[in-house]
Amino acid sequence: MARITAEDCNKIIPDRFRLVVLATRYAKLLNYKVETNQIKKEKRDKPPVISLRRIAAGKVSVPQLEQDLINSLRTSSMIEPLVNQDESEDVEEKFEYLPEVYIGEDYSDLDDQIFINENGEDYETDK
């Protein structure tokens, strides 16, 4: 399989690294797309072999495959900026259910604690 098919593919795609990337992409497309009629005829071969054979036979459009690969690698999720202030106000309203937290200045939980002063000496807090 590999040597003869790869040598045939080198006539169409001379760079072996590029060939590997494009053949891998086409093999993945064969796995995920519905091409069961053609794959049933070539059932004994796996998708990578089928993709190499189709590339060697010229049945695959290499520029189209390259464009498909580039499109698959692009990130399609871009952050959209807020258009108006009403949307940001809606976010603030969603957090109204949170309870308010009171932070007091009562240090009673620190009673009976041992602290170190600036001189490095231990001292206990007095009430």
Swiss-Prot record:
Disulfide bonds: none annotated. It catalyses: RNA(n) + a ribonucleoside 5'-triphosphate = RNA(n+1) + diphosphate. GO terms for biological process: DNA-templated transcription. GO terms for molecular function: DNA binding; DNA-directed RNA polymerase activity. It comes from the Bacteria. SUPFAM superfamilies: RPB6/omega subunit-like (SSF63562). InterPro entries: DNA-dir_RNA_pol_omega, Pol_omega/Rpo6/RPB6, RPB6/omega-like_sf. It is an enzyme of class 2 (transferase). One of its GO terms (cellular component) is DNA-directed RNA polymerase complex. Keywords: DNA-directed RNA polymerase, Nucleotidyltransferase, Transcription, Transferase. Its EC number is 2.7.7.6. HAMAP family: RNApol_bact_RpoZ. Belongs to the RNA polymerase subunit omega family. NCBIfam families: rpoZ. The RNAP catalytic core consists of 2 alpha, 1 beta, 1 beta' and 1 omega subunit. When a sigma factor is associated with the core the holoenzyme is formed, which can initiate transcription. Promotes RNA polymerase assembly. Latches the N- and C-terminal regions of the beta' subunit thereby facilitating its interaction with the beta and alpha subunits. This is DNA-directed RNA polymerase subunit omega. It comes from Rickettsia typhi (strain ATCC VR-144 / Wilmington). The gene is rpoZ.
